[in-house]
Structure formats: structure tokens, C-alpha cells
């Protein structure tokens, strides 16, 4: 995985150490929500980077599960017809006349709609299925979701919309778990932006705020404590000390640093 190779450059101390970087593909499970929550509640993770689409109240995790059998195809069609029926009901349409229209439009056998699509049991089942595809604000309470990863990067639109009454990033911070800082986007985020730029500084004595400060992405913000830092790895360069002194001579020496993040920071400070 290319991204994993990049993280070994950000955090070279992890090279040769097994099981230090884990990866979850959203297509591994459908729905993946509970698997993701279980991973995020582990107490042995330091950093999580989440790639998905988002809104201020939602992490979009899954779409419709791939259809592999004829039965699944039939269930998918009937479920979508029920959605049409529900939307029409809200507009005051008559079900019997609508049924005739839908059977003709989608070339459906009349027996497929024998069950009452407006039955509460079916509506609840459909709503539950859709809700489980994504992670919502209320899921933190419903599932007792308490993230324990100290630093979380949410590479998605809107999840850091702090101007709303609540947002996904807020919930990561204010749960009883151990998450201290979340880097998230207030508005739309470019899909090709450099989401992990300078993330390696967190292993060199840099604080989370440094990552956002030097990334220059207008939509990204730290929700939580921007001064949070990890204990630096042995032989680190003490990023915060260098920034405090801000000596040109020191930055020039670091232009030859074997650490890409430190070398990039030196270029940033000298330009």
C-alpha cells in the first residue's frame, strides 16, 4: 500500500517493527461502522487517519453493498421501490395508484409488492439498514462510542464544522475516551490535498498545532488541544525548540536532514 510506505517515511522509527501500522478498507465489511469504532476504541493506537466523505453530522463509510445473488438483487429493487413509496406518501400520494405506476415504470411483477411497503416493520428495517451504512452524531451515544486514539485526522469534508451546534470532530473530543486533538475540515476539502503533510513532526517533539500551522490548508483546523505532543523518539531534533529559537544557521543544517518532515520544515522556514 503506497500510503503505508509514506508513513514509514514520516515515522522511520517504525521501520522493521511489525504490526505498528494497521489498515482498514471500508469494503472489508459492509457495514464497516462497528469494526471502525472497535478499532478507534483501542488503547494502543496513537494516531488515526480516516479517509472518507463527510458532513458536519456524518462520517460516510459505506454505500450499497455489492449485489451477488438474484435474491439480493430482488431485495434491492423492492427496497428502492419502498423508498419511492415513502417519499410519495410524504407528499400525500395514494398508494394504490402509485403502485400501478411503479410496477409499470420498473416492469415489476405485481406479487413483488404484495407486502404493505408502508408497514412499520419494513420502514424500521429500511431505516436501520441505511443508518448502519454511516457513522452519525447520535451513534456516539447509541453505541457508547468512546474513541481512545489521542490524535485523529479526519480527511473528509465538513466533519470539523465547529460553527455548527455540534459536529463529528466535537464528539471525538468530548467523549469520555482519550482523544485529545482532531484535525478536521470545516468546509469542503480538496480530494487531492496533502492530508498528512508534516504529520511526522509529531514524532520529533512537534505539537499537533505545528502540523496544521505549516500545512496551509484553509479548511483544516485543530479541534481540541493544539499543544498536545507525544514523547519524542530517541534522537529527535526537538522541533518546538528549533521553532522557538528560529536560527537561520540551524535551519540550514537541517536541509540535509534524513527526515523528510524536518527537511521540509527547514525549507519552509528559510524561504
Which ranges hold each PLM region?
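Cysteine-dependent hydrolase recognition
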Residues: 1-271
